[in-house]
Amino acid sequence: MKKYALMVLVLVMGLALAGGVFAADKDAIKSQVDEIVAAIEGGKTAADFKDAAKKEPYYVYILQEDGMVLVHPSLEGKSLKEAAMPAYEAVSKATPDGTWVQYTWKDAEKNAYVRSTKDGLIVGSGY
């Protein structure tokens, strides 16, 4: 009985810790996107954030409202509408205040925080 109780305790603690890390990751993703939106609205361009598209584990992507990808690890210069319409439909729900969206990308469920800039760019990142 003690072994069973110990296993349950370890499982519960593991889930609690994973949830804490998960919340911290969501906060980091949101902060990163918010900082980039503020920088773009302060005069930076999407091209200034090309290095952010290479960061792991949560790369940043920036696209125009029409779906043209400006910053992304592999889709730069392509239309997200043509490459992945469901992903485009999700990220195009970006608001000036930011919102979390879900979509499927390469058979995996994705969650992304997306915000729109005053000039209509969409900045996002997720897991």
Each predicted region: which residue ranges?
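Absolute protein N-terminus
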Residues: 1, 23-24
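Short hydrophobic beta-strand segments that form the core of ligand-binding sensory/regulatory domains
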Residues: 122-127
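Bacterial N-terminal signal peptides that target proteins for export
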Residues: 1-8
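Extracytoplasmic/periplasmic sensor domains and loops in membrane signaling proteins
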Residues: 27-43, 74-102
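Membrane-proximal, non-catalytic sensory/regulatory domains of signal-transducing membrane proteins
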Residues: 47-61, 86-119
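Sec/Tat signal peptide C-region and signal peptidase I cleavage site
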Residues: 13-23
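Amphipathic coiled-coil signal-relay and dimerization helices
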Residues: 68-74
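Juxtamembrane segments flanking the first transmembrane helix
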Residues: 24-59, 65
